[in-house]
Swiss-Prot record:
Location(s), subcellular: Cytoplasm
Catalytic activity: [[Fe-S] cluster scaffold protein carrying a second [4Fe-4S](2+) cluster] + N(6)-octanoyl-L-lysyl-[protein] + 2 oxidized [2Fe-2S]-[ferredoxin] + 2 S-adenosyl-L-methionine + 4 H(+) = [[Fe-S] cluster scaffold protein] + N(6)-[(R)-dihydrolipoyl]-L-lysyl-[protein] + 4 Fe(3+) + 2 hydrogen sulfide + 2 5'-deoxyadenosine + 2 L-methionine + 2 reduced [2Fe-2S]-[ferredoxin]
Protein name, as recorded: Lipoyl synthase
Cofactor note: Binds 2 [4Fe-4S] clusters per subunit. One cluster is coordinated with 3 cysteines and an exchangeable S-adenosyl-L-methionine.
Domain Radical SAM core: 53-269
Cellular-component GO terms for this entry: cytoplasm
Organism: Geobacillus thermodenitrificans (strain NG80-2)
InterPro entries: Aldolase_TIM, Elp3/MiaA/NifB-like_rSAM, LIAS_N, Lipoyl_synth, rSAM
CC cofactor: [4Fe-4S] cluster
Annotated [4Fe-4S] cluster 2 binding sites: 67, 71, 74
Keyword Iron-sulfur found: yes
Coiled coil stretches, renumbered: none
UniProt family annotation: Belongs to the radical SAM superfamily. Lipoyl synthase family.
This protein's pathway: Protein modification; protein lipoylation via endogenous pathway; protein N(6)-(lipoyl)lysine from octanoyl-[acyl-carrier-protein]
Amino acid sequence: MATKEEHVRKPDWLKIKLNTNEHYTGLKKLMRENRLHTVCEEAKCPNIHECWAVRRTATFMILGSVCTRACRFCAVKTGLPTELDWQEPERVAESVRIMNLKHVVVTAVARDDLKDGGAAVFAETVRAIRRKNPFTTIEVLPSDMGGVYENLKTLMDARPDILNHNIETVRRLTPRVRARATYERSLEFLRRAKELQPDIPTKSSIMIGLGETKEEIIEAMDDLRANHVDILTIGQYLQPTKKHLKVVKYYHPDEFQELKEIALSKGFSHCEAGPLVRSSYHADEQVNEAAKARQLKA
């Protein structure tokens, strides 16, 4: 299945049609009116209709749309970031209210230009959402924030319902896939998050198809469990443009199912694995029982 050709043909199970109905169009208009960005749109996520219209979940990207890193799998723009917008937390919170979301994921570009890595705005966004939407559950998906403990503590003190930080790939491929991050620093970030707030579930994600072996995927699972990570998502890497890393292999859905079973056998409380699975997929199901009780009132 793997080849060295520049263009590996996409298998049939990855060919889907995006559903862009009136509901989708209305929500997209709302995002633009509030000068907000969603990963759902920017990444052209295939699950956007299911998440927005059916599951009432969405992923907002804060701290601007320009990243200070240039990871070789990611299509987000890189360069000189914009100034901090301290009104952004309230705009996100109001959009969550208008969209009547049951679960919201807040992620951000990496802001290595900021001493706190954007932690203060992240934390204020969590608090603003909770003030206006007390029953909506909140997941945060930050960068490693430079690996600075105080930055992570600022974020965890806001008490999100899930702390998600993605290792993205296996140990061997990390220097090539995300050169300005390290595998060990990401593991330490996840471990410290659990130490700060033991009752808050921690989560990470791996994309496969970059040349890793099955043994390396399993090793990554073991590394995550050794650092007390509760939830895992596994999805197929898709090359955003010709400038990005090539796809080495398209995994069959049966292979994803096998990986899911292995992950659950290792003690992960929840695992989503499939060709179109992304970090936020079915995120509303992954909160703890107390948070699920809140969702029922949303």
